[in-house]
Regions:
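PRPP-associated nucleotide enzymes
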Residues: 1-313
């Protein structure tokens, strides 16, 4: 008797509906119906408005802002489990708490590990995410993790710019692996910024390792938070003789006065995905959607086909 995969349905947490609608459209099915009730004390309760018994359920939820979205996702996973869904895959374009991947000082938690345990305890049978801040977070899970790379969608855009004398730059030492991966596909040089922080999100000094004289520079990073690092790196590149400076960052957190920093910086363009909705528009920010990538990989998961071809890094 042949084995037939269960039907798939896609649902979304309340703050990821727009992205989920695009994913569902690319996938070729309507977005599933779910309602969210909120009690007077602030508690919320999701409810699936259609049967999911025996089905493969994808739940799209970027966990930013972190606390409420994560709790909402956990409740949706639990509800799907109790409604007898056969497979439950949280699709987490931006994985919150990923910066807490180790103990970097005494008496602090490993938040990413805790989140992994919570997702699995709630009932997740597979995890799908994109550009984790630290690759080793995949090892925090016992269930399979499909870790996608935004390079799949960024590289075609970069190639379309036809930039001469292109140089890829990492804004810090930790991102050098990512920078070298991009340079491999673009056949370009690499430079690295060495920074020393005074405190979290506060940069002390920054120095450049490499030459950018007469080059068109593209900074690559997994996220942009306050924007301080990229703004300072762009200023440094121009100071060292770069012709232009762009940046590609998968996750646009853009907290505090980040928009103002970007507008006032030497960055010609900031390219991001829609893993996190932008708070406002900016003439310097270009959004490249990750919806087609997620829809394609979700199809591959549904059909039990290899997704290794989607990994460019």
């Amino acid at each position: 008797m042949s084995h037939q995969e269960p039907e798939a349905k896609i649902f979304a947490c309340s703050q990821s509906v727009h992205l989920a609608e695009q994913i569902a459209e690319k996938y070729g099915i309507p977005l599933g119906k779910v309602t969210f009730s909120k009690f007077s004390d602030g508690e919320f309760q999701p409810s699936y408005e259609e049967s999911i018994r025996g089905l493969r359920v994808f739940i799209v939820c970027s966990t930013f802002p972190t606390a409420d979205n994560l709790m909402e996702l956990l409740l949706m996973i639990d509800a799907a489990k109790r409604a007898s869904a056969r497979h439950i895959t949280p699709v987490i374009p931006y994985f919150g708490y990923a910066r807490q991947d180790r103990k970097d000082k005494p008496r602090v938690p490993i938040g990413a590990k805790l989140v992994a345990k919570l997702l699995e305890t709630a009932g997740a049978t597979r995890i799908m995410t994109m550009d984790l801040h630290a690759d080793q977070i995949q090892g925090f899970f016992e269930k399979p993790v499909d870790h996608l790379f935004a390079s799949t969608i960024f590289l075609p855009y970069l190639k379309s710019l036809n930039l001469e004398n292109l140089t890829i730059a990492s804004p810090d030492m930790g991102g050098s692996k990512r920078a070298y991966a991009y340079s491999k596909f673009l056949d370009s040089d690499v430079v690295i910024c060495y920074k020393q922080r005074k405190a979290a999100n506060v940069i002390g000094t920054m120095e450049l390792i490499g030459d950018v004289q007469g080059k068109n520079v593209v900074l690559v990073d997994d996220m942009i938070d306050t924007g301080g690092t990229l703004a300072k790196a762009a200023d440094l590149m121009i100071e060292k003789g770069a012709l232009s400076v762009r940046a590609i960052c998968t996750h646009a957190i853009l907290s505090g006065d980040a928009y103002e920093k970007i507008e006032n910086s030497n960055l010609l363009e900031l390219i991001v995905t829609d893993s996190i909705p932008l708070k406002k528009e900016s003439k310097k920010i270009r959004v490249v959607s990750c919806a087609p990538l997620f829809a394609e990989v979700m199809h591959m998961v549904q059909n039990n086909t290899s997704i290794s071809g989607k990994f460019l890094m």
